[in-house]
Amino acid sequence: HFHGYARSGIGWTGSGGEQQCFKTTGAQSKYRLGNECETYAELKLGQELWKEGDKSFYLDTNVAYSVSQRDDWESTDPAFREANVQGKNLIESFPGSTMWAGKRFYQRHDVHMIDFYYWDISGPGAGLEAIDLGFGKLSVAATRNSEAGGSSAWINNQRKDADKTINDVYDIRLAGLETNPGGSLEFGVDYGRANTQDDYSLAPNASKDGVLLTAEHTQSMMGGFNKFVVQYATDSMTSWNSGHSQGTSVNNNGHMLRVIDHGAINLAEKWDMMYVALYQDTDWDNNNGTTWYSVGVRPMLQMELPIMSTLLEIGYNNVKSQRTGKRNGQYKLTLAQQWQAGDSIWSRPATRVFATYANWDEKWGYNNVDKSPDNGLAQNGTIGTDSRGKSNECTFGAQF
């Protein structure tokens, strides 16, 4: 079986040069329509290796590539994203469940229009998922990620720094809890901790561990869906804010609260729309957190069924620095004419021509001076921001 994902294209900036993409300093994502500046591909190969009755084994692999789309020949090292085996119905007492081990994209939750994965513990791991409890389905898993350095040891009176320090994440989810007609709840608890080698220790005041709590309500509505999400994280789980842990850091002690409402619906005949509203407050003890607001819509009008449509994406991001009290704001508009394989807003592949306009007001950035004691800390001014010395720009191009 072959599955995959790819995007590529060509674009220009109105003031000259190649297409530049727009992202608000401090925000964790950007509005992506007409605002992607790289060639990226995931090539998935899989095969059912064995089947007997309702029991089976499936091998799944995924290799990803990313280049800057500036030339014909662009070499890159592939990223080995997935290599796992999934066994279904192997445990008689848990019919319908799947036992798995290996590297895997594990039950990822995202907002498509801003390419934001708010619950994603993907990596090497193992687990048992979709255990039917009658009132819902239980999944348990353990995965791993790593950090550069992060721990050290004194060996033969010499300090040795670890090349990498691993973090383990333990995940429990209960999904499919029916709450109302067309609606269901999912709850999750993720515990992440740094796991050092023997004789190695973390830096004083390292966050060491943390938790991420997630509650998500999914509602079928208007020919599509709406998802309402509330998440709370502490300490090591506040760096990436997605479920991965960074327990060696001394800069992420604190907490995070996030609320998201997003979905895709049918407004009327020939009219579909994606939308998102997001609030995220990261409060760190070192006063270097942020408060991020985002709101956007992407309506689509079918011009010629089933292949041609017109899309308009309007998105706004605002990020307040905990340290400086200043705000970075940006709005972005994209108009695109699209030809796609079907009449849904999700239909792919799709080829489009687009024009994008962005306007921003950046008041703070991050100190990026190497070896500075303030490196990585927020500061007033536009140094260390994505403003490029201007306040607005337009781009145009074609992509799929």
From Swiss-Prot:
PANTHER family for the chain: CRYPTIC OUTER MEMBRANE PORIN BGLH-RELATED
Upregulating conditions: By maltose.
Name under which the protein is recorded: Maltoporin
Gene3D superfamilies membership: Porin, LamB type
Molecular function as annotated in GO: carbohydrate transmembrane transporter activity; porin activity
Annotated keywords: Cell outer membrane, Disulfide bond, Ion transport, Membrane, Porin, Sugar transport, Transmembrane, Transmembrane beta strand, Transport
Site label Important in sugar transport, positions: Y117
InterPro entries per the UniProt record, alphabetical: G_neg_Bact_CarbUptk_Porin, Porin_LamB, Porin_LamB_sf
Gene: lamB
Disulphide bridges: C21-C37
Annotated site location: Greasy slide, important in sugar transport: Y5, Y40, W73, F225, W346
Function: Involved in the transport of maltose and maltodextrins.
Major location (coarse): membrane
Subunit structure: Homotrimer formed of three 18-stranded antiparallel beta-barrels, containing three independent channels.
Organism expressing this protein natively: Yersinia enterocolitica
